[in-house]
Curated annotation (Swiss-Prot):
Disordered as annotated region, ranges: 188-224
Transmembrane regions listed in the UniProt entry: none
Function recorded in the entry: Plays several roles during the time course of infection, including egress of virus particles from the perinuclear space and secondary envelopment of cytoplasmic capsids that bud into specific trans-Golgi network (TGN)-derived membranes.
UniProt cross-references to InterPro entries, sorted A to Z: Herpes_U44
Subcellular location as annotated: Virion tegument; Host cytoplasm; Host Golgi apparatus
Protein name: Tegument protein UL51 homolog
Gene from which this protein is expressed: 55
Entry superkingdom: Viruses
Amino acid sequence: MSSRWIQWTCCGLWPFGKSSRQYRQIINVYEDDSERVRAEIDMGLPPGVSVGDLLQNRQGEEAIRQAHMLALQSNAITDYLQRFDSVRVPESCQSIVSAQIAKLRSVQHIIWNTMISMAVGNVTIDDSTLKVLLNKQAGESMALMEMEKLAAALKMDGSTDWAQNIASVVTAPPRAAREQMAFREPIYDDPEGGMEMIDLSSTPGPTPAPTPAPSMERVAVPAS
């Protein structure tokens, strides 16, 4: 028994008939609407092509290069922040680390604002301005190398045992100085282990000022 609302196909049963592709009317009215223009571009692109592919031409090559350089800087900052968020920073290092993290986040916000301006405003920045921005990022993060060492230590050792000796390592004298201090001769040699008492009451008073020497001037004697 067959019915009109039942259709048999080679792939199965379609109770309400075989579905057809939904029809979408092509927008042919051009208005000053960024969302409409964006939808038209997305609709008109061939399969497998994105808006980013369209920018990879001679006109957008400079913008892509600059955006890539800024993205690398932002990714590096994100990596630092993720490292320090994954471990517990000792209390003795929290003030220094917090100050550097605040600088890194402020620089990352500057980079993000620049990339947003390049994407939304369709503008590019010249190489000199980009170098100034990157140099500013390096200037405001002068302790990046020290943070790299600290981050490497945090990554290698997840515990906080390594931080217990930081103060002693920083404040202790160098090894050569320590060895020299260890083999230095004592000022007072007291083999009996006693202590020499000094009577402060018998301490002599201030030394009097020296008497100036008599003058040895020559006096001319008239000849007789």
